[in-house]
Amino acid sequence: MMRNYNFYTYILTNYNRKVLYTGVTNELEKRLHEHYFGLYSIDGKESFTTKYKCYYLVWYERHQYIQHAIEREKELKAG
């Protein structure tokens, strides 16, 4: 059974708009803050968004179900 919440698929870019990052979250504002301040890393390694300075939100889409948000992220990444 899928749970009914607000989920977001989003795209960030860097200042020069040369790099794109696509992600999914249930708290868009909080997640953007985490990207901007580099608060999310894996095993102490610099995150992709920190490394490439992807701090600019260029697009987002709200979804009612997490599975729909994940499917949309996969579509976007596939091109």
Segments from the language model and where they lie:
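Basic, flexible Lys/Arg- and Gly-enriched helix-loop patches that mediate nucleic-acid binding at interfaces
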Residues: 46
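Short, intrinsically disordered, charge-balanced linker/junction segments flanking boundaries
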Residues: 76-79
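GIY-YIG nuclease catalytic motif and its immediate N-terminal context
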Residues: 1-40, 50-62, 68-74
